[in-house]
Amino acid sequence: MKILILGADGMIGHKISQTLGSSNHTLILNSRTRSEYLNNFISNATFSNYDFLKQDVTELLNETNPELVINCVGVTIRRGADIIENAIKLNQKLPHTIAEWSSKHSKKLIHFSTDCVFSGTKGNYSELDLVDAIDNYGLTKGKGEVQSHNTLTIRSSMIGREL
């Protein structure tokens, strides 16, 4: 299977890339700036450096034509969610653009969201609870969640290192 991983150098993306790097899948790893680090531990992949703040993701999707897109892109709290324009573009709009392309081309999308879509005041949240984030990160990630027949959105709570 041809798999495109977006945000391949982030907390989630680099572990998925590392795991799938030992498979027989054809991998395309996108990192805005750090593909040289990925190349140190994944040798059987193609690398791209699209910056989705400046470039249209559909260019990369059309160029690579993956069967599966794994979207791990996100403007996190410590990486500038206070720059609301970037958070809106990457956390909120980008997933819907990818989902639209995936649906149009009969491809699959796995999109990573976050438990930060919840304020934390209620506790014991389920997937049926309404999003009630109070910060820019949670608000934009919540609005970026995709519900489509060809899409799996995963709300995860990840704390860890990036490359």
PLM regions: where:
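Flexible, glycine-rich beta-alpha linker
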Residues: 118-121, 154-163
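N-terminal Rossmann-fold cofactor-binding loop
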Residues: 29-38, 51-52, 74
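N-terminal Rossmann NAD(P)H-binding glycine-rich loop of SDR-like oxidoreductase domains
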Residues: 1-24
